[in-house]
Amino acid sequence: VSAREDGVIELRSEGFEPDIVRVGDGAAYPRFSSASLISGIAEQIAERGYTVGGFDAYTVSSVYKGSGLSSSAAFEDAVGLIINDMFCDGALSPLELAIISQRAERDYFGKACGLMDQAVCAVGGLVSLDFADENDPKVTQLCPNLDGLGLCMCITNTGGSHADLGDEYSAIPAEMRSVAEYFGQRVLRGLTAEQIISELPALRAEVGDRAVLRALHFVRENERVARVCRALAESDTDAFLGAIAESGRSSAELLQNVTVPGSSREQGVTLALALSGELLRGVRSAYRVHGGGFAGTVQAFMPPEAVESYCRGMDAVFGEGACRLTSVRGEGACRLV
């Protein structure tokens, strides 16, 4: 990264055409473009009273694009960090940068998204997020990595992409919201599975079965989050794996985000989950869909001695290098030098 005096941000990413943005020109950059993200981040930081200048930057990434590995959030947080470091003396907190990144993706890029990906990338480590107050979410770093559990995490890219699945992804919160509205609420938080089950006949008629199933997933998933947090705090490997396995089954059966409706020829995520079950049979492990689902990646947790054979088996089906042993970095978006 290097500064420039003409108020232009030129960002070149390996393998992509350069993005050129003139700071403060008020231009509307094409939606779904990296330039729109850069412009949105710079504009929001300027609105907070900082003088944002130009710079040149070159980025290299090994994150699979559109695979559910938060590639857009990583890009956004990197741009925000550069501007924060160069023009704000580091005054913006990781959470502030995450909120700026989310709004850039939602309002400038044009894709509906939550705050989870941006917050985790900005903060680093294993993180819990509480959105009771959407304007002031609580972010807690639980631990820096998985070392305390004696587990490794492998991510397998099944070859599908999230890039054209916006409608499927957006339907999930919309359907959950329809259940919340039935109970006179804006969101599902605070409802119990028992409340939903007690109203099943009426709910089925009003919102449909899939919406009900997704709502049940939501309320139980929040319970599992609390269990995972306790397991990490207590280094309880069995409790952690149990909750992850339950979450994976619930995603497939209730949330229904492992296949694209109507797609019978390509079901990469479902196949990867089934293959994981075969490869990890008898191994202390857990696996589930990763990211927004429908396509992209799966995650699997296992002891170190199981990694080599697991990756070999997954690569044999999804291609050389599809399965990667990954680590959780304790530090989020940061300046290295």
Which residue ranges define each predicted feature?
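Anion-binding (especially nucleotide phosphate/pyrophosphate-binding) glycine-rich loop
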Residues: 1-100, 280
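C-terminal nucleotide
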Residues: 2-36, 44, 128-288, 300-337
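Alpha-helix capping and helix-loop boundary segments enriched in small/acidic/polar residues
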Residues: 29-32, 66-74, 92-95, 106-110, ...
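Short, hydrophobic/aliphatic alpha-helical segments
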Residues: 52-63, 98-107, 249, 268-286
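Short, solvent-exposed positions on alpha-helices
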Residues: 53, 95, 117, 238-242
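Short, internal active-site loops enriched in acidic
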Residues: 60-66, 103-106, 196-197, 293, ...
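Fold-level recognition of mixed alpha/beta catalytic cores in primary-metabolism enzymes, strongest
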Residues: 67-155, 337
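N-terminal pre-core extensions flanking Radical SAM catalytic domains
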Residues: 292-298
